Every structure is written in structure tokens, then in C-alpha cells.
């Protein structure tokens, strides 16, 4: 076979060949970065975050970044973090661009495709991390390289931090953001942070909403436990540990924490109302007012999504008890997972749990470090810039400030005094993040890349 035919045949066998389209050299460079990241396994079990960080560091150095401005810092051989800097003219505090390199577990037998081979198929990129969070990681590295090649000098330094163990959060002593704050804070000190947590929503192919996250709920689990002397099951007693715990959990199941609105949730309901009609739209406008309407709150609380925006929530997620089929239980234990509003002290949450489940004999113990994460102020200048770029790229799409009901590494930065915002311009339909066959739309990925580059340049030249 002639050499030209050999090359053509190899290209046809490439995982990207089936759906690949003609791309500009810049788009191809970005795709190479993205593919390299996705195809490096960065799961906690067998992956290597340091390998991914070093691969990105090599690309930045090859693009002309001095070694002093590109560092891989690792508290563990496989938990490396990349910190890179494009130096500006010094007019303002740096802008930190944050993404995490680690991904959740993915077993080949659970997927219809190889999770660690980037596949382009039917208008989507498939692979673990394609949406969470290697899309933003690749975009930030690509953006720094593009700006460097353009000779762009920002008014303030641009810092890219690609970190480890976001998915494990507070349970990991190697969480990259927490470790960098504790050990290398000057390298990431910034006046503003752009991170995951926002992003767009597609509905029926329409770009419906671009979200700007300014705050997020704090996750904290509690262990509820009852211990007992037990005994033989042929002689039941009234102080059965399982019954006592079950009674407390039943009381919790009927309890709602009080509504606590903040700046982000008020604006969320005010703007989301425009996407609805009838009673739902009226109720959203009514709860956005000060004070919110009680009847409207009650109706919206029946929806699990809106309820999560309105109050702290605590729900039983695990249950165990007893040690033998013919013995009275000596122990009954449950895990209650709480998602705590950013302005709601964790001490108050625990006191409320004690009151609701009934106190003794049920003990309640936090399973992690109690943590109060503040909100970031809703920056009107940032909001205006996001609105302008969104309107240019997707006319008719509204920007909605929001509070995340999950958790990202922004919580550690907000607590450290870094105003942090979740915004990406990545519009996701069924992304399947954390699930089987994770994917992102090809066009949506490239549009998000363009959105973030425009936003970065905008913010880099801001006074």
C-alpha cells in the first residue's frame, strides 16, 4: 500500500475521525490539549493527576512561558497541581482561572465506549471528564497559550490553577485548592476567581439560560447513633435502638428548615420567572420580593429544585443497625446529609437537628469539618460583561445569577476571601457528568472556549 493510503487508513481508524470536521489550526491545537487531558486517567483509584499537570506544564513551556511561571506542586506523587501565570502590567489584583483535573471513577464495562479515549461521535465528544471538568481545564491552558502568542499583555496577571481532588472535596487531605491555600497562597492570591459551577442550559436545542454562580451550599453529613445494652430477641424491650432512631428520622422527614433568601436566590427567582407562565411565574416574582410571599413559598417548596434554593436541607442517606437476627440491637446508626445555605451557621443546623430528632438517646456528630462558606458579592461589572458576551453569542439567552446546591472548590476560596464565580459559557444538555458515557456537544465546547476567551480578555483589561 502506498504511504499516502497508509496515512489515510490510519486517520479513518482514529477515534476522532468518525465525526471530525475541518478545524482551524487554533481549534486543532485546543483539541490536542483537550484530548491529552481526557486520555490521562486522573481517577483517585488508579489515576495520576501529576501526569496531567505535567503534560499541561510542558505545553505552556513550549509556548514560551518561563519555567518560573509554570509550576507543578504536589503534596503526593500522584496529586500534583499546576499553577501557571501570564504576567500583566500590574494594574490590579490577579485573575485566577480555576479548574480541577481529577475525575470520578469510570469502569470500562459500564460504558459503551472507552472512558479514557476521546471519541467524537454524532456531534458529541465522549469520555470521562469531557464536561467535568477537563473542558474548562483545556480552555484555560489554550487561552493562556493563545494570549501569549498574540503578545497580549493583561492589565493584571492571569493565573491558571489546575488542581487535584475536587471530586473528593473535604474528605481528601490532598484537595489541591485547600493545599495551595495552606502552603502556596501567594502563588494563587487573586482579586477574582473564575471556576466551574455556572454554565448554560440547553432545552430543545435552544440556548435558554447562562448561569453565573455567586454562592453555593455547604455539604456536611452527620452521624446519628443510638446505643443500647441489647439482649435476647425473645424478650423485647421498649428502648429498642432501631425504633428510637427510626422515630427520630421520621420526625426529621416531616421537618422543613426555615426559608432563608439571599441576593443570588432572589435574583434567580426574579429572572427565572421570565421562563415560566401562570402560577409558577407569579410565585417566583412573589418570593423575589422583600418580604417573600408565604403562600408562594409554600407552593414553590413542593418542587425539589426550588425547595433546595429556598432553605437548608437535611436528608437521611444511609441506615444500619443490629448485629444478629435473634438479638436486640445494641446499635442503630444513620447518616444524614445536609446541604447548608451559605449564610446559615453549621452550629445552628446541628442544634436544630438535635431539637427535631429528639436529643437523647440519639447522639448527633458531624462527620466532617463544620464549615461556613460565605457568598461572593454579586459584582455588577462582571454581570454586565457576562450579559454582553452572552447576548452577542446567543441572542435572547438570559443570564441568571444562581446559588449552587452542590459544591465546588470555590467554597474554600470564598472562605479565604477570594471573590469566586462559576461561569463557563458551556451549554450542556444531557452531559452525563459523573455517569455513564459522559459527553459534551462539539459545537458547545468550541462556543464555550470562545466565550471564556472573550470573558478572560475582558476581565484582564478591566481596571
What does each model-identified segment do?
Residues 1-6:
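Bacterial N-terminal signal peptides that target proteins for export
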Residues 14-17:
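N-terminal signal peptide c-region/cleavage motif recognized by signal peptidases
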Residues 21-128, 137, 147-156, 336:
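Acidic/His- and Gly-rich active-site-bordering loop/insert found
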Residues 31-42, 225-228, 365-372:
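Acidic/histidine-rich, surface-exposed loop or edge segments in extracytoplasmic proteins
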Residues 90-92, 201-203, 260-323, 330-331, ...:
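An extended, acidic, His-containing surface patch that forms the Zn2+-binding/catalytic region
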Residues 124-125, 131-211:
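Acidic/histidine-rich catalytic neighborhood of metal-dependent amide-processing enzymes
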Residues 175, 179-182, 234-258:
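A short core secondary-structure module
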Residues 239, 349-357:
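Short amphipathic alpha-helices in soluble, non-transmembrane regions
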